[in-house]
């Protein structure tokens, strides 16, 4: 049974898998509506273990790389470090204390652990969510408002925001150690067991608390992230259109003449008519350098376009994964707050276990989409762990691609940067 009833996938409690009733003032399991099939515990253990190992490994690597590599201590990476710590905390304090009691049908860790784990679970979920919001706002400022955001995009400001986030989360979740207690009950085999449950004094307070968590940990953060990443995607899309217009304008001003002997109005006609010998010498002297410059420009433009499209796709993945991981558990807890009996009948046992597992998945996908998908972080990882195989030095195309990929998360994708690059670009 879900004996750790107050264990947080999202800072709330989880229904038990059997319907509880009172007999002689003692809680008993009246029935077992969903008898677990033989394969379900094995699958549950396998999936929980896999998510646990991936989360611990991924977040530990992120923390190690960002702490040991001083060159990577940027404003964004400071937020990513805080996110990795909170995700690691979520994994360590949530998964074992949910899986083990679920399998044993008894919370065997005692009252002190019940209060401590529920408190740290709620705090880790809150910090993780607030960090995701802070990262989205920081990226919005860097890309869409680069000039205005320079004032507050400093390491000291990031550290203040992170400290405030942790203090606020610890404060918000103080009801958990106060109202989390062990509740004894009698199982169907007449053995006495315990549940770790978070129970407020009355139904109104319980419903208000769940509604409060639904707002501050899911709906409001989700809306903020959607708006921020939507505006960033719009900015990048406008940049893609700007690049296309610039490329078309450059082709119109600089038509190719290598494959045709006819000359129309333009530089080609002028170069053939005025002082042909000198022009030929100048062309011969300038051809290698100008050809290389044109190739670099073309490669840079292509890499920049591809990098912007990758960022847009990644932002969409971030928003989709946030809602996919957290919507089921928040919906389940809100349902249980307002209709306890119906929710416990339909969600008890295996359904709620896998809903919780889905929420825990966020702790292992965050390091992947925020860090390991970033080329600079991968290079920092290789620099931190020199024992790992290192790829050969990239060619000019790879260097340009790396530079442009890094720029997609900075201020160079702003409107100011587009106009600045356009004004300062050399003429054809």
UniProtKB/Swiss-Prot annotation:
GO terms for cellular component: plasma membrane. The keyword Ion transport does not apply. PROSITE patterns: G_PROTEIN_RECEP_F1_1 (PS00237), G_PROTEIN_RECEP_F1_2 (PS50262). Residues 250-269, 393-428 are annotated as: Disordered. A lipid is attached at residue 387 (S-palmitoyl cysteine). InterPro entries: Cholcskin_rcpt, Cholcy_rcpt_A, CholecystokininA_recpt_N, CholecystokininA_recpt_N_sf, GPCR_Rhodpsn, GPCR_Rhodpsn_7TM. CDD domains: 7tmA_CCK-AR. Keywords: Cell membrane, Disulfide bond, G-protein coupled receptor, Glycoprotein, Lipoprotein, Membrane, Palmitate, Receptor, Transducer, Transmembrane, Transmembrane helix. Residues 1-41, 105-115, 179-210, 335-349 are extracellular. Residues 409-422 have a biased composition (Polar residues). The chain crosses the membrane at residues 42-67, 78-104, 116-137, 158-178, 211-234, 314-334, 350-373. Glycans are attached at residues 10, 24, 190. GO terms for molecular function: cholecystokinin receptor activity. It holds the Pfam family CholecysA-Rec_N. Residues 68-77, 138-157, 235-313, 374-428 are cytoplasmic. Disulfide bonds join 18-29, 114-196. Gene3D superfamilies: Cholecystokinin A receptor, N-terminal domain (4.10.670.10), Rhodopsin 7-helix transmembrane proteins (1.20.1070.10). The keyword Transmembrane applies. It is a multi-pass membrane protein. It is found in: Cell membrane. Receptor for cholecystokinin. Mediates pancreatic growth and enzyme secretion, smooth muscle contraction of the gall bladder and stomach. Has a 1000-fold higher affinity for CCK rather than for gastrin. It modulates feeding and dopamine-induced behavior in the central and peripheral nervous system. This receptor mediates its action by association with G proteins that activate a phosphatidylinositol-calcium second messenger system. Belongs to the G-protein coupled receptor 1 family. This is Cholecystokinin receptor type A. The lineage of its organism: Eukaryota, Metazoa, Chordata, Craniata, Vertebrata. The gene is CCKAR.
């Amino acid at each position: 049974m879900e004996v750790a009833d107050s264990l947080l996938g999202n800072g709330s409690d989880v229904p038990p898998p059997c319907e509880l009733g009172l007999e002689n003032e003692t809680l008993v399991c009246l029935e077992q509506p969903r008898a677990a099939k033989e394969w379900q515990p094995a699958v549950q253990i396998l999936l929980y273990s896999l998510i646990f190992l991936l989360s611990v490994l991924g977040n530990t690597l992120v923390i190690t790389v960002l702490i040991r590599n001083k060159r990577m201590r940027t404003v964004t990476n400071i937020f990513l470090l805080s996110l990795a710590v909170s995700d690691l905390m979520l994994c360590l304090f949530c998964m074992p204390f949910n899986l083990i009691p679920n399998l044993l049908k008894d919370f065997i860790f005692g009252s002190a652990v019940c209060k401590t784990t529920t408190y740290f679970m709620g705090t880790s979920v809150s910090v993780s969510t607030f960090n995701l919001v802070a990262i989205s706002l920081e990226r919005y400022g860097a890309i869409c408002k680069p000039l205005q955001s320079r004032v507050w995009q400093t390491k000291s400001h990031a550290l203040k925001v992170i400290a405030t986030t942790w203090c606020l989360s610890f404060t918000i979740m103080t009801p958990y150690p106060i109202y989390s207690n062990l509740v004894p009950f009698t199982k169907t085999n007449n053995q006495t067991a315990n549940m770790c449950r978070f129970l407020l004094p009355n139904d109104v307070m319980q419903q208000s608390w769940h509604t409060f968590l639904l707002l501050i940990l899911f709906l409001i953060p989700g809306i903020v992230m959607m708006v921020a990443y939507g505006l960033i995607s719009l900015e990048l899309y406008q940049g893609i259109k700007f690049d296309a217009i610039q490329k078309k304008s450059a082709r119109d001003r600089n038509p190719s003449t290598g494959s045709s002997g006819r000359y129309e109005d333009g530089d080609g006609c002028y170069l053939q008519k005025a002082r042909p010998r000198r022009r030929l010498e100048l062309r011969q002297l300038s051809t290698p350098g100008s050809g290389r410059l044109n190739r670099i420009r073309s490669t840079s433009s292509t890499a920049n376009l591809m990098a912007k499209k990758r960022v847009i796709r990644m932002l969409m993945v971030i928003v989709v994964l946030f809602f996919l991981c957290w919507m089921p558990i928040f919906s389940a807890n809100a349902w249980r707050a307002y209709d306890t009996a119906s929710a416990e009948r339909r969600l008890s046992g295996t359904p709620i276990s896998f809903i919780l597992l889905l929420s825990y998945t966020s702790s292992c996908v965050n390091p992947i989409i925020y860090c390991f998908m970033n080329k600079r972080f991968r290079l920092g990882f290789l620099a931190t762990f020199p024992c790992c195989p290192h790829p050969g030095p990239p060619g000019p195309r790879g260097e340009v691609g790396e530079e442009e990929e890094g720029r997609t998360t900075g201020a160079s994708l702003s409107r100011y940067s587009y106009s600045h690059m356009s004004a300062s670009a050399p003429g054809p």
